[in-house]
């Protein structure tokens, strides 16, 4: 116990130390004189690593000296730079990054808007994949005026693929029983446990999905590179990779050079007096300029990313909530937005990027949006990389839904159940004893199978949830019951397909959704609407409320204590093991 509390206070002390150190560093940075913007600036940006949707609620000091720009920061800054006469162009150094398909389309569209204002946009990378993995980064690069590749780099524009494991034979060998139900044939999330091979319905669904996404990529690449679509298709199917010179010969590249030389080329392209200027420094400049907002009420932009849960769990390492869409957290945000004592937002844009989650918090969030609409506040949902299952459940409450062409959309279905381990335990000589006040108190335990009555009741619950989900879609999207069932069955669609099926209203990025919300609210179209972002960025005080706030209530204290106990036990009794 003494070791446990030693570790506990060591973590707390470390958090306080780094928070204060980070705050001092940030104050030092803020106190430095701002770099003067050159008259002919070329913005330099590295796109690599983790690029979050928004800076969110993670306090700045926890990142010490620097905090990476979010995707929203990038696109807003590019839009600002497009209208700035001092900015002549952009040069990007592209590295491995976390951008998904829809986010790549967001960034491509921002680059296109930048170029449409007469600016040049250049991009360089050391390689577009190695044998594989180059399609998505090349898709991003194709939106730029010029693409440069380092010597010895490759262009692995090889298309898209999915690989899924099917572990039924392994589970059978270990006498583990996967007891799952799904509604309907395309809701195959649990098939990895229940089947030995991919089902034909899953193969049909995923093949159609990848083909539609790849068709969008080929169409966009062909347009920007001034190539024939058949030629781009042939390139994607003919060889695993092209070396730099061969890729240039085929029209995929403009230059084969090193990044330092490419920067010099970009500076000269801006004309006499052209100078490189860091994108992050310009972003700070743009944020200050951007405070000159319209006189209209602001639009509330709420970011919601991750699995949908009732309450976000707390990491025992960082002492901060893990990334999730928490109905509790969103309830707090919307209670603030709808507070009758405060000015109401002109509209609400909810940015959803989620693979789904539990139906109960999904329904809670659905109600938050309908409450907002009842107060005559327009609601627009912008869907990111995906809005599947519970993510789409939430979206059905919106006045309008905006998605990218590649957004994974739908999965209108239900799956659930449990892994049954009783035979595995017996195999290793372990017996579980239990006591209960009723026959069904232990129904969801993995240590015993469902009884026939419990399995029937569980399936009835799955049917009820599925029917309820269908009703939400039918009413929210104004579709007949027959049409709703046709597009449901657990199937996922691209945003482009979803538009044709009536599941979304418009294709576009987050900025398109904000503009649409402004139109619904009747805001002045001649000015850029003011936007207030939620969750709000916290300062130093937010660290302690975020980290220690859960200690103020019993459930939070229990969760945090369990996390510390798991960490302390694993470090002392089993040094080689870390719980996941």
Locations of the language-model features?
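Hydrophobic alpha-helical transmembrane signal-anchor segments
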Residues: 2-35, 39-40
């Amino acid at each position: 116990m003494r070791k446990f509390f030693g570790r506990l206070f060591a973590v707390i002390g470390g958090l306080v130390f780094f928070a204060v150190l980070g705050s001092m560093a940030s104050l030092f940075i803020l106190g430095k004189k701002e770099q003067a913007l050159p008259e002919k600036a070329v913005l330099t940006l590295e796109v690599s690593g983790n690029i979050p949707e928004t800076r969110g609620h993670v306090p700045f000091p926890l990142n010490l000296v620097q905090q990476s720009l979010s995707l929203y920061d990038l696109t807003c800054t590019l839009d600002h730079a497009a209208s700035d006469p001092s900015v002549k162009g952009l040069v990007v150094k592209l590295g491995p990054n976390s951008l998904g398909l829809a986010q790549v389309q967001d960034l491509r569209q921002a680059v296109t808007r930048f170029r449409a204002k007469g600016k040049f946009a250049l991009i360089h990378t050391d390689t577009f994949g190695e044998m594989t993995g180059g399609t998505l980064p090349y898709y991003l690069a194709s939106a730029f005026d010029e693409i440069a590749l380092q010597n010895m780099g490759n262009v692995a524009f090889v298309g898209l693929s999915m690989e899924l494991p099917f572990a039924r034979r392994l589970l059978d060998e270990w006498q583990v029983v996967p007891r799952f139900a799904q509604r309907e044939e395309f809701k195959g999330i649990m098939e990895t446990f229940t089947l030995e091979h991919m089902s034909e319905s899953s193969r049909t669904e995923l093949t159609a999905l990848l083909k539609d996404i790849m068709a969008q990529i080929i169409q966009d690449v062909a347009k920007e590179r001034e190539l024939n679509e058949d030629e781009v298709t042939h390139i994607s199917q003919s060889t695993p990779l092209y070396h730099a010179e061969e890729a240039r010969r085929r029209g995929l590249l403009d230059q084969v050079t090193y990044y330092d030389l490419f920067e010099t080329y970009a500076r000269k392209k801006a004309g006499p007096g052209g100078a490189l200027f860091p994108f992050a420094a310009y972003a700070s400049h743009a944020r200050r300029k951007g405070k000159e907002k319209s006189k209209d009420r602001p639009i509330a932009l709420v970011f919601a990313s991750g699995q949908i849960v009732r309450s976000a769990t707390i990491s025992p390492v960082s002492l901060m909530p893990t990334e999730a869409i928490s109905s509790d957290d969103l309830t707090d945000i919307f209670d603030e937005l709808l507070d009758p004592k405060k000015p109401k937002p002109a509209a609400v844009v909810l940015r959803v990027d989620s693979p789904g989650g539990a139906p109960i918090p999904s329904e809670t969030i659905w109600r938050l949006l309908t409450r907002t609409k009842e107060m005559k506040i327009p609601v627009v949902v912008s869907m990111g990389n995906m809005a599947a299952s519970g993510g789409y459940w939430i979206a059905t409450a919106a006045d309008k839904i905006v998605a990218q062409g590649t957004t994974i959309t739908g999965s209108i279905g239900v799956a659930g159940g449990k892994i049954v381990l009783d035979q595995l335990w017996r195999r290793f000589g372990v017996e579980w004893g239990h006591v209960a006040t009723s026959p069904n108190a232990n129904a969801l335990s993995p240590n015993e199978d469902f009884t026939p009555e419990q399995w029937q009741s569980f399936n009835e619950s799955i049917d009820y949830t599925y029917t309820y989900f269908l009703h939400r879609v039918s009413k929210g999207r104004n579709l007949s019951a027959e049409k709703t069932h046709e597009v449901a069955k657990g199937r996922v669609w691209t945003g482009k397909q979803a538009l044709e099926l009536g599941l979304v209203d418009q294709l576009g990025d987050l900025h398109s959704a904000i503009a649409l919300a402004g139109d619904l609210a009747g805001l002045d179209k001649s000015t850029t609407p003011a936007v207030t972002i939620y969750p709000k960025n916290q300062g130093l005080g937010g660290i302690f409320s975020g980290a220690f706030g859960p200690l103020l209530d019993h459930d939070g204290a229990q969760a945090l204590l369990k996390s510390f106990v798991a960490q302390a036990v694993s470090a002392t009794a089993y040094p080689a093991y870390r719980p996941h």
